[in-house]
């Protein structure tokens, strides 16, 4: 009898263990977070530089034409220490920034400012764009600088082969895209965020948030890379709809995009797999106001504009 009971007992224990032991979790892992607050006042963009990050600040809540407050400045944060690299005095509306070598390009209203980061105390070179263009974001690819104007819906290119001498460089119209926000370039492809279509004749139940891409940078044409309807049809979920995407950056291996998402009640950080085009939320917080983010040192740095901080997410 014992010979028959022993195998049965072992099988019984196996079944019980399957029921009791926890199954592997498929829930998303919340990344470790920290924040930078020292000196930050209305920051809209962060970029990596020399083992740290450059943080652009308005210094004031006013960032519209006609509000002539020269309060903008650039911070540099490295190894837990923050210093003012470019103090107030020139910049009015430093929104997007980009770096090539030791040169910093700053979108400043209708002006593009070019600073030598080894000598930030020197006056910047200035390229003034024709009105009514209002500069939003910047991205570098080799010797080309891309600059977006969100109020008109235009992306420009500038030749930055010789950033030390920009006096004869003129911006060239490159791509028209209504509501253009931010850009990320890698492996010969540009990815773009833009405001969703709106207006009195637009059916809001069909409005989509779209990530655009340009596959041929020499012959630019915007095409939809990813789209998702703003309204899902679920009344509970639609109380916190995604209003628009803003910041966008490539992962260090160029296999994914990280995107900032402005929602009705929360702000969220999304990751979009470039190969599968699957999107998921990696971080969400009530009141988060995420702008143009960047990735460096296996972490995301996200300017949280209205909350006067830069959020750091460990990846």
Regions found by a protein language model. Give the residues of each.
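Conserved beta-strand positions in repeat-built beta-propeller and related beta-rich domains
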Residues: 39, 55-68, 105-111, 147-152, ...
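Beta-rich, blade/repeat-based domains predominating
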Residues: 39-50, 71, 88-103, 129-142, ...
